[in-house]
């Protein structure tokens, strides 16, 4: 079942975060995931999300976890987590009951 990684965060240290995007792009490309949306000026409808929102599409939740836990991603994830404040979730695609 298709799964989505959704991250919403505020950048707290722009200089520390700056190398993250160029480093993550080739890792994402190697997984075959699809970047559905990425916005540095997210507009809140409810609550207090960060200004950055990213939505990634994976073939399955297992594929999403494989990317997240891969040695390649784990080597750079700190560039995001150390320099931002926010959330990231991995969710299954929803299909209405028949």
Language model regions located:
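Short S/T/G/P-rich N-terminal loop/turn motif that feeds into the first structured element of a domain
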Residues: 1-52, 59-69, 74, 92-98
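Short arginine-rich
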Residues: 72-90
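Generic beta-strand structural signal
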Residues: 52-54, 86-87
